[in-house]
């Protein structure tokens, strides 16, 4: 198994730049790819990404708009939003050496196909080896070198362990796993549940309500994960419970911020949609196909679709039939 000395990061946003810093701290030679040549040139000359201000780029990070140059790396991190993953992978796929690990660093489910991130990679780049990195991590914390732990999953345990060795450092601790689907479900479900948490905060329903919502939401995440064969230790680990706790903690999460605006009756934050807005209806359909009850996720999907008011959704959740806790 290769030591993955060279690592490319496709996507020069805040999260991509933070992961480039992670790889550099781990002693790897890093290529950070930006599709926009002007953006790449600015980062390269300023040695700072305006999307991650105050964080100087390490000397080991080269910045380029040349995708072929990035594709020569031993492993490639794909750091683009979930709904843009297929396009990014299709562009880089013809340039990759056979078997190159492609690590998805997005959390979500592809709209329209209902495919998880590693499934998208497998379809768009059959020559590559899919993997997934997920867990409780905000870009600015990671870029600053604050202690962070995540999960990195691949079907082959030796590959997952080698990727962990390539990225791990005293400030960034990945745990390896072969439970790819469990990791993906945790990342996708928590986006939707974070919108619900934001709504609770925006409505000023109190800390007790937020705790109840987070706990019952986690029960939904676990039910869906188990229906897809996920392992309990994955769902209760960093990529499941850990990420849910972080994302429900405050407006630094784009999904929580979207829910907060909804709860306050304000327009949704300008710019890109929160990933949970795409994922909510897909998550509900996946749950229905497996006979899994996800009332909180259903409520979020209905609110986003304009099918129910927030107050009516809250009332419906509170008036569900009483039952034993599970």
From Swiss-Prot:
One of its GO terms (molecular function) is NAD binding. The keyword 4Fe-4S does not apply. InterPro entries: 6-PGluconate_DH-like_C_sf (IPR008927), 6PGD_dom2 (IPR013328), G3P_DH_NAD-dep (IPR006168), G3P_DH_NAD-dep_C (IPR006109), G3P_DH_NAD-dep_N (IPR011128), NAD(P)-bd_dom_sf (IPR036291). This is Glycerol-3-phosphate dehydrogenase [NAD(P)+]. Pathway: Membrane lipid metabolism; glycerophospholipid metabolism. NADPH binds at residues 15, 35, 107, 139, 254, 273, 275. The gene is gpsA. Keywords: Cytoplasm, Lipid biosynthesis, Lipid metabolism, NAD, NADP, Nucleotide-binding, Oxidoreductase, Phospholipid biosynthesis, Phospholipid metabolism. Its EC number is 1.1.1.94. PANTHER family: GLYCEROL-3-PHOSPHATE DEHYDROGENASE, GLYCEROL-3-PHOSPHATE DEHYDROGENASE [NAD(+)] 2, CHLOROPLASTIC. Belongs to the NAD-dependent glycerol-3-phosphate dehydrogenase family. Sn-glycerol 3-phosphate binds at residues 107, 135, 137, 190, 243, 253-255. It catalyses: sn-glycerol 3-phosphate + NAD(+) = dihydroxyacetone phosphate + NADH + H(+); sn-glycerol 3-phosphate + NADP(+) = dihydroxyacetone phosphate + NADPH + H(+). The active site is at residue 190.
